Amino acid sequence: MLKTKDTVLEIDNIVKEFPVGKNGKMTACNKVSLCFEKGKTLGIIGESGCGKSTLMKIVMQLEKPTSGQILYHGEDITKLKGEKLRQHRRNIQMVFQDPTTAFNPKMKVKDIICEPLLNFGLIKKGEKEEVAKKYLEMVELPAEFMDRYPHNMSGGQRQRIGIARALVLDPEVLI
């Protein structure tokens, strides 16, 4: 792992083990170390079940590592809790593999896209349509989609809604 002055996120010796049976364990990530640099794209490849998604869930703090650190600008985010963790989540966003399960099916597209902004108090409810339109255009979907529900869209269209939602907070790291 080569850390530079442009390193934004550092994954340092991450191990994730899941209990199996009475005394067993299954290792999903075994001493993984990576650096994410500002302005760079990093692809993580591997066969099904090798731990790619688990690693990204650890970065997002949706899973806790068994050991190791995730450093964001030098701060170990695996130790964050409560409001500090919530504020940190503005900086790192994720586009989930299956957008169908990532969205509340009772929410319209404009609400899905704008929910993060409302949660952080960055827009008022009256601004949702303007913001949703901007981000729908960004992901090349028509503005009239904002009043649709995700189950009325194709898988590719739902994926683009997930991308728009992840981009709306202008994160420093996008997974």
Language-model features: locations:
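ABC ATPase NBD coupling module
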Residues: 22, 77-93, 119
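The feature captures the beta-strand-to-loop junction immediately N-terminal to the Walker
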Residues: 45-47
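Helix-to-loop junction immediately C-terminal to a conserved catalytic motif
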Residues: 60
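Conserved ABC ATPase "signature" region
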Residues: 76, 127-144
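Conserved signature/switch motifs of ABC ATPase nucleotide-binding domains
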Residues: 151, 169
